[in-house]
Structures are given as C-alpha cells and as structure tokens.
Amino acid sequence: MKDKVLLGHGSGGALMADLLKNVIFAAFPDVQPTDGAVADVPAGMRLVFTTDSFVVKPLFFPGGDIGRLAINGTVNDLAMMGAEPALISCGLIIEEGFALDDLRRICASMSRAAMEAGARIVTGDTKVVGYGEADSIFINTSGIGYAQPVYGFSPDRVKAGDVIIVNGGLGEHGMAVMAGRLGVSFAPELPSDSAPLWPQVKALLGAGIVPGVMRDITRGGLGSVAAELAEGLPLDYHLWEACLPVDARVVKACDIWGFDPLYVASEGRFLLSVGPAQVEEALRLLGPAAASIGKVSAGSGRVFLHTTVGGVRPVRPLPGEMLPRIC
C-alpha cells in the first residue's frame, strides 16, 4: 500500500508528515508549515476574496485535470471582479486508497496552473476519509486578489446599446469532460478550454476598456449566464446564433449526446459587455477566437436567441443539471 493514500496520511502523525513533505510541500514550495499565510495588501488596492470547490469526474480529461481546473476556476472568479490573482489556498479531501502517483500529478498540475496565472499557493489543508466515503479526491481552493477601487463590474452597469462579446469557443470544457467520462475521442482531440482569464482581463483594463459586466461561462453555459445577468433589469439581451463561436466538434458531440451548446459549460470563457465604440479594440485584445455575439436593448429582463433560420426564441436559465460534475 506504499503507493496508495492511507487513513494514516491524515492522522497528523509520521505518515502525514511524510505525505506533506514528499508530495504537498514538494509541489507547493510557497506553503509554510504554519496555520496560515500572512500578506500585505498593496497600497490603494481593494482585496477581493473568493472560494470554489471541485468534484469533476473523471479527474483527468482531454486538456486538463481537476488540479488545473481548481486553480483556474478560482483565478477566474477573481478576474471577473477585476482582481489580479495573488494568493491561493488548497484544501484536499482524499479517499483512502487513492493513488499517490495521481495525487502527485494533480498537485504538479495545480502548481503549474498557479504559476501560469501569476498566483502562489500559500496555505492549505489535507484530510483523508475512509474508502467509499468520498469519490477519489475533492478539492477546495480559495483565492485572494487585488483590484483597483474604480472597478465595479455589475449587471446593473450594462446599458442599452452595449455589445455582448465572448472571448472564445463555447462548450469545449463540457464536451471534453463528457468524452473523458465515456472514454471516447475526437479527431483531432477536443481539449478542455480551461485557462486563466486574468491575462485577457488585464489587457482590456490596461487599454482603458472597462466592461459593464464580466461573467465566466461555467455551469449552465452561455444561456444560463445571460439569463442570470438580464434578470430583473430593464434590459433585454439579444444573442445571434450565427455569431456564436462553437467548434464543429462541440456541435457534433451535442448532436450525438443530446445537449444544447448554449447550455454547455466552459472553463476558460467569459461574457462581457462594452460600448459600441470599444468593440473593435476589445476583440483585438481578446484575440482571434473572440466574437461579438449580440446586443443589449431596453426591455424587461429577457434574453432572446435570434436563430439562423430567422426565428427568435427565449433563452431561460437551465432548469436542472444537464451535465453533472463538470467542475
């Protein structure tokens, strides 16, 4: 059992000390063996704090794994608040019998993702539960970032006439996880879109483009996100189906498995609203995969999809769970 996680690895004794030294601290060199981490808030900045938990299945999927997802998910929540990611905590709940090699692989992936995002994993916790009391491994990450006080992105800052933009192809993470779960593959491979969003947000803000709202397109996909943003406001969101950037492999997978691409999750995509004069520059900064997908008008909190065949259909929040455990 030397290659497996044992209950003793969570006991606080010699086995746990060995696990921390040879697996956790080896992957996260900024973690100190103390009860927490201490940091200063840069002068003139606001502290932004967020937390998220990850239970994705399978743990490893095309283009990513639960470790990369756990870092990017929290980093992206900070980015949507206009905050540069700085400090991350990592909480691991591990099932007895979990392979140590897989744990090392996950921790190494988290370390790489944090470095890519410019953040540091500085504190954490590890618990081991009995066999059958969890499903392999669950991860919680909390993050602290720093934002300029002038930024305050909110649905009520969106204005009639604003243009809706997404930064890349929709639904790729959800379909990559589904493919991994079913053991099928695409040619060429369809990887998860999991990625840190801060570099793109930083580029926008640095160019003086301050969106009315930003929201990462995760569970519930674009449809649910747009419906949530519009709800209760004197605005309507109009989405143009012909403009939605959806990879042909995502379309094919959705056709086969009975999903609507409008509601499939991404993990490296976000929606933003900008004024008409800033659209061209925003698209340039976001890169060639970005697309202008709709507009905002005066209305009553509704979302409409203008279809490729000339119809218009309402877009409502996803009523239930279409694809469970995708993050």
Question: Which residues does each predicted region cover?
Answer:
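Extreme N-terminal starter segment of soluble prokaryotic enzymes
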Residues: 1-5
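Active-site glycine-rich loop that binds ribose-phosphate moieties when present
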Residues: 140-153, 185-206
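Active-site-proximal betaalpha loop/short-helix elements
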Residues: 14, 95-97, 190-266
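Aromatic/hydrophobic pocket-lining residues that form π-stacking "cages" and hydrophobic walls in ligand
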Residues: 74, 110, 226, 250, ...
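Glycine-rich phosphate/pyrophosphate-binding loop regions near the starts of catalytic domains
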Residues: 6, 14-166, 172, 177
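Short Gly/Ser/Thr- and Asp/Glu-enriched loop/turn motifs at secondary-structure junctions
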Residues: 33-34, 264-269
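Helix N-cap motif at beta-to-alpha junctions
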Residues: 273-279
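Acidic, Ser/Thr/Pro-rich beta/coil linker or hinge segments at domain junctions
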Residues: 286-327
